[in-house]
Regions:
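Acidic anion/phosphate-binding donor-loop and adjacent secondary structure
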Residues: 86-87, 129-144, 158
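Donor nucleotide-sugar binding/catalytic pocket of nucleotide-sugar-dependent glycosyltransferases
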Residues: 101-136, 146, 150-152
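Conserved catalytic-core segment of nucleotide-activated headgroup transferases in glycan assembly
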Residues: 144-196
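Nucleotide-activated donor-binding/catalytic signature segment of Leloir-type glycosyltransferases, i.e.
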Residues: 192-216
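Acidic donor-binding loop of glycosyltransferase active sites
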Residues: 220-234
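Short hydrophobic beta-strand element within catalytic cores of glycosyltransferases
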Residues: 245, 249-252
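A charged, aromatic-enriched C-terminal amphipathic alpha-helix characteristic of glycosyltransferases
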Residues: 268, 282-315
Length: 315
């Protein structure tokens, strides 16, 4: 099969240099299409003509609309949580709905978005993980678990908004007197400058702009991943799957319709999160095994194979 993914543009590097999400997904799918023996390319929308490929896969709403105008059939994959946050009267929702309506099929990485868009072309398609890049190391149950959060915080133009739940993770660490690391891009400085109380915790370690090449080592230096997010386009999102692949049991909040073995589901409630922490510590080996199994199931090689089946059904 001849497959082309549309480059997301807007200054985004594919393959990704450092922090990123869409560009990582595009690149991993590309590599795994090739691994399955398909022809795969990544091109800008303006470079694609009708009939050039068997399938054109677009990850950005306005670029999908551009393909419509060029007469290029496409599969659309939505990644933008703002379409939900701003509501159905917003420009971003209408743009993504237009991209869906003009597609031959549309994919969303969360089941709540299937219901939200309520369109017959929309189906759930989970994110994946490169298990060669992220993998576990042997680790016995720690006496004092080191907690880890990895995220780019903020919401809808407000970079200090605690969408990712840093305050809950730090409060959990304080309540149990445990070390915690919060890692992400420099954008997270806005959160800490607006939540100065967090900086008073002596066991808090903050890392900005960690290169991708050092991310696996960061996971291996920690024991439990904390992710009390309030809004994600992906359930599970990429960092949850990365943490699981690296062998970290997880305390997180994600949609109830999606099963994720190896994680304890807790709302944004420090006391409920503490219960999850206790359950993980009491069943350490079981959580480690289950999160590893989840990561293997979600390997990008498997996700690419499933995606090709979807292509074959609609072209």
């Amino acid at each position: 099969m001849r497959i082309c993914q549309v480059h997301p543009a807007c200054g985004i590097d594919v393959p990704p240099k450092d922090w990123g999400a869409i560009e990582k997904i595009v690149w991993e799918l590309h590599l795994n299409f090739l691994a399955h023996g398909h022809e795969s390319e990544i091109k800008f929308a303006t470079e694609i003509n009708p009939g050039d490929f068997d399938v054109v896969h677009c990850h950005v709403g306005n670029l999908a609309i551009m393909l419509q105008e060029q007469g290029v059939p496409y599969v659309f994959q939505l990644h933008d949580h703002h379409a939900y946050h701003y509501g159905k009267d917003s420009h971003v929702f209408r743009e993504n709905m237009k991209a869906i309506e003009g597609s031959i099929a549309s994919l969303v990485p969360a089941r709540y978005l299937v219901d939200y868009f309520d369109h017959p072309k929309v189906q759930y398609f989970a994110h994946g993980i490169n298990n060669k890049e992220f993998y576990p190391v042997e680790k016995s149950k720690p006496k004092e678990p080191k907690l880890l959060m990895v995220a780019n915080n903020g919401l809808a133009g407000n970079p200090s908004f605690d969408r990712k739940g840093f305050s809950y993770g730090i409060a959990l660490a304080q309540a149990r007197n445990l070390p915690i690391t919060v890692a992400g891009p420099s954008n997270n400085k806005h959160f800490f400058n607006s939540h100065l109380w967090t900086l008073a915790y002596s066991k808090l370690n903050i890392i900005f702009d960690l290169p991708n090449s050092k991310l696996l080592n960061l996971y291996h230096q920690h024991d439990i991943f904390i992710h009390p997010t309030m809004l994600e386009a992906g359930h599970p999102n990429l960092t949850m799957i990365e943490a699981a692949a690296a062998g970290l049991p997880i305390v997180a909040d994600w949609e109830h319709e999606t099963v994720f073995h190896g994680a304890w589901r807790a709302p944004r409630d420090v006391f409920e999160m503490a219960k999850g922490l206790d359950d993980i510590m009491n069943n350490w080996d079981d959580y480690r095994q289950r999160c590893s199994n989840t990561a293997q199931e979600l390997d990008w090689f498997n996700r690419a194979e499933e995606l090709v089946k979807i292509y074959q059904e609609v072209i």
